[in-house]
Structures are given as structure tokens and as C-alpha cells.
């Protein structure tokens, strides 16, 4: 406060413990989430106390709070996931699609924001010191996910995104023929012969850590055709709005 700071962002409090960089923003002695119990659904008593105490002391000094929810949450098998294995941490766009991951995020948000801080007597949702609650950090349904492509256990989540993209295309165009017509420009068609939304085989758009890029004047039938890109972005924005 003496340096003029009036807002603090409480970032990545959900990060797991372990070796760097996996635990890049979590206290190894008392993390907020007690992953030692085999899931990420319970608070570590000391970790929650540290969180509450820090928030209260910031408030005492006139510093407002920016609360992050999901940042580096480690989704593990003990959370009761839809698919076998651990989904892992920092998986970005997938928690915006999968219903079970969304349920887990809601559960965490309710527990964190609605419990009463013993040092202030207020829950975060009622505390005027909280000026922002950020639901997701660097997350978007249109974000690239190439960093997870090498992981076989993430395939069910990638398949889920593709299925929902194909369902979106069917709602928009109804038939493969109409989709093909919409994706054709000056005799070039972006829809491959082996792609059919009825069969769920139309590929979406992927990229690296950032939103995939598209050059509007690139080859129309390229791997990221402007037509495919436009529909995938519309689809992703729809997911973002419903999240």
C-alpha cells in the first residue's frame, strides 16, 4: 500500500504442488486445494486460512481484490471425470466444453466465493473489497490446444469438441450439400471429400497456445480455410457465451 498499489490479483491459487513449473504459483506446504486427498475438490485447511488472512490484510490496507477462479486447476481422476485418467492442468479450452469440468468449476467457485472469511466476517461475494472475479484465465473455446495434442488421454476431449462443432454445422446448414455450397468460393471447396457433419468428421481449427490465426486471403481450400475458420470462430463464440 505504501508503494501506491491499490489492487492485488490473487492468481493461480488453484495450482497443484510438485516440481516446477507444475507448481509455479502454489505454496508447497499449504496449497489452497488439497490434492493429496486424490482430487481437487477440497480445501487444504492451512491453505484456505492463508488465503483468507492475506485477503483480510490487503483489505485492511485499502487494497482491493481481483479474484481468479480457474487458472491452473489440476483435473484428476479422483474428481469423477467423464473419461479415464487425469485431464491435467492448464488444459485451456476443454473446461469450457465438457459438462463435468464445468460442474467442477462451479463447485469450486461456490466454495471459494461463498465461505465466510473468519478474519473479515464476510464471504467474498459480499465483500466490497472484491472488485473483480475472473472466471477463467487465458481460456476461450477458440483457443489453440496443440500443447495437449501429444497426450492420448486428451483425445476424448478433442473428440468432444469436434462432435459439438459438427452438431453446430448441422444446425446451421442442415445438410452436407448446403455446407459444401457455403464453403465453396470460385470453384474451390474447403470441405474435404472425407468430411461430413452427419458423420461428425468435419475438422475444427486448432492452433498453439494462442487463438489460431487465419489470413483471409490464404488458399480457400487450405488446412485453415477462411470458410472453416469463420464457422469455427462462430461456433466457439457461441460456446463462450453459453459458458
Predicted regions and their residues:
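Active-site mouth of glycoside hydrolases
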Residues: 1-243
Amino acid at each position: 500500500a505504501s508503494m501506491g498499489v491499490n489492487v492485488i490479483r490473487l492468481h493461480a491459487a488453484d495450482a497443484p504442488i510438485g516440481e516446477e513449473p507444475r507448481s509455479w504459483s502454489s505454496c508447497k506446504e499449504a496449497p489452497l486445494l488439497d490434492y493429496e486427498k486424490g482430487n481437487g475438490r477440497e480445501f487444504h485447511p492451512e491453505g484456505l486460512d492463508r488465503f483468507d488472512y492475506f485477503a483480510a490484510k490487503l483489505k485492511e490496507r485499502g487494497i482491493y481484490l481481483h479474484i481468479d477462479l480457474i487458472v491452473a486447476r489440476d483435473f484428476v481422476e479422483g474428481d469423477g471425470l467423464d473419461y479415464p485418467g487425469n485431464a491435467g492442468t492448464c488444459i485451456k479450452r476443454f473446461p469450457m466444453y465438457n459438462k463435468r469440468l464445468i460442474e467442477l468449476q462451479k463447485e469450486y467457485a461456490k466454495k471459494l466465493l461463498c465461505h465466510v472469511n473468519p478474519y473479515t466476517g464476510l464471504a467474498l461475494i459480499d465483500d466490497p473489497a472484491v472488485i473483480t472475479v475472473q472466471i477463467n484465465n487465458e481460456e476461450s473455446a477458440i483457443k489453440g490446444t496443440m500443447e495437449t495434442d501429444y497426450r492420448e488421454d486428451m483425445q476424448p476431449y478433442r473428440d468432444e469438441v469436434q462432435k459439438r462443432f459438427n452438431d453446430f454445422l448441422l444446425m446451421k446448414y442442415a445438410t452436407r450439400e448446403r455446407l459444401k455450397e457455403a464453403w465453396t468460393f470460385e470453384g474451390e471447396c474447403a470441405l474435404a471429400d472425407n468430411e461430413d457433419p452427419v458423420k461428425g468428421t468435419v475438422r475444427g481449427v486448432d492452433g498453439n497456445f494462442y487463438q489460431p490465426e487465419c489470413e483471409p486471403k490464404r488458399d480457400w481450400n487450405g488446412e485453415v480455410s477462411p470458410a472453416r475458420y469463420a464457422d469455427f470462430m462462430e461456433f466457439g463464440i457461441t460456446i463462450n457465451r453459453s459458458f
